[in-house]
Regions:
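A structural signal for multi-pass alpha-helical bundles of membrane permease subunits
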Residues: 44-318
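Transmembrane alpha-helical segments of polytopic membrane transport and secretion proteins
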Residues: 1-49, 278-282, 304-318
């Protein structure tokens, strides 16, 4: 009895596309599994614990010192709290509500930092989202070179642009020493990195989704607000955290463009002045420093789930 060799059946393009998509899905799932295994490995867990302990101990010491009397702060370390626990709220009262030339009076500086940090983080994110979408999905001549130019701006130190920008703000626009000057400066310095990171995320969104929206009659504005922004929330939240923390902790840009005036000066400027008082307000520094990190902690922990999702999405795309 003779055997008949099987005949190779032709495979149409549709089946081939489905096969390729299935293989890509398997590869993506495997890549995600590998990333999760690395993040949950024994060495990764040990490293995370070590980093957490190293970060927590000085933060806890700062928190304890902020409630200790001035005499105890000057004469002993914070670890003596365990043998001689004494608490007081005088440091916070003097830092926030005391008036006078020698007092810290951080309340006005704290509000100035909020007024600077919130727009200083929102403006680059808003402009960066639109620019990243245009560079990723709106074809126009020179888009590639424009993206390379924007990426190259990250190499230029911001210190080189301080004097030219200050001259423009003071001599041309007349806004030196005001909040808009600080907002514009932070927007200019933050935009290149924001555009670069968001472009990488937005360009990885499947084009079939956008094509389906165009078939349904959606224009670029509708696609941007109804598709791109909802899908990019994890990336936007991650970048917003970095931008907000950078603006909140910044001293150089705010000091240059605010002019150092009390009405516009941020919290970091007042902390730098207190550090330079040769220990006169040493007992107020722990309370002042802890007040300065409250807002970044609130922002980070409130957006933590988006931050982790954004990091994982950026690590597994491609």
């Amino acid at each position: 009895m003779s055997s008949v060799a099987p005949v190779d059946l032709p495979i149409d393009d549709e089946n081939k596309k489905n096969t390729d998509a299935f293989q890509e899905a398997i590869a993506g799932t495997t890549k995600v599994r590998r990333v999760k295994q690395r993040l949950t490995s024994r060495w990764a867990t040990v490293a995370a614990i070590v980093i957490a302990v190293v970060w927590t101990i000085p933060t806890f010491g700062l928190f304890v010192s902020s409630f200790r009397p001035a005499v105890d702060i000057r004469t002993s370390g914070w670890w003596t709290f365990f043998t001689n626990p004494t608490f007081t709220l005088e440091n916070y009262e003097e830092v926030l509500f005391a008036s006078g030339a020698s007092s810290a009076n951080l309340s006005s500086y704290f509000m100035n930092s909020l007024v600077i940090a919130i727009p200083g983080a929102l403006f680059p994110i808003a402009l960066g989202c639109m620019a990243a979408y245009a560079l990723a999905w709106i074809p126009f001549r020179g888009a590639g070179w424009l993206f390379v130019f924007i990426f190259a701006l990250q190499i230029v130190p911001l210190q080189m642009a301080l004097i030219p920008l200050l001259q423009i703000f003071s001599q041309v626009l007349g806004i030196s020493g005001t909040f808009p000057a600080v907002w514009i400066a932070h927007t200019i310095f933050g935009l290149p990195l924001v555009i670069f990171l968001l472009h990488n995320f937005i360009s990885a969104i499947p084009g079939d989704i956008l094509e389906a929206a165009k078939v349904d009659g959606a224009n670029h504005t509708q696609i941007f607000f109804r598709i791109i922004l909802p899908l990019s929330v994890p990336a936007i939240a991650s970048i917003a955290i970095f931008q907000f923390l950078w603006v909140w902790n910044d001293l150089l840009v705010a000091l240059v463009f605010s002019g150092g005036t009390v009405d516009v000066a941020p919290l970091t400027q007042r902390l730098a002045e207190m550090v330079g008082n040769f220990g006169r307000n040493q007992h107020l520094l722990p309370a002042s420093a802890f007040i300065s990190i409250i807002v970044p902690l609130i922002v980070f922990f409130s957006l933590q789930r988006y931050f982790v999702r954004g990091l994982l999405a950026g690590a597994t795309k491609g």
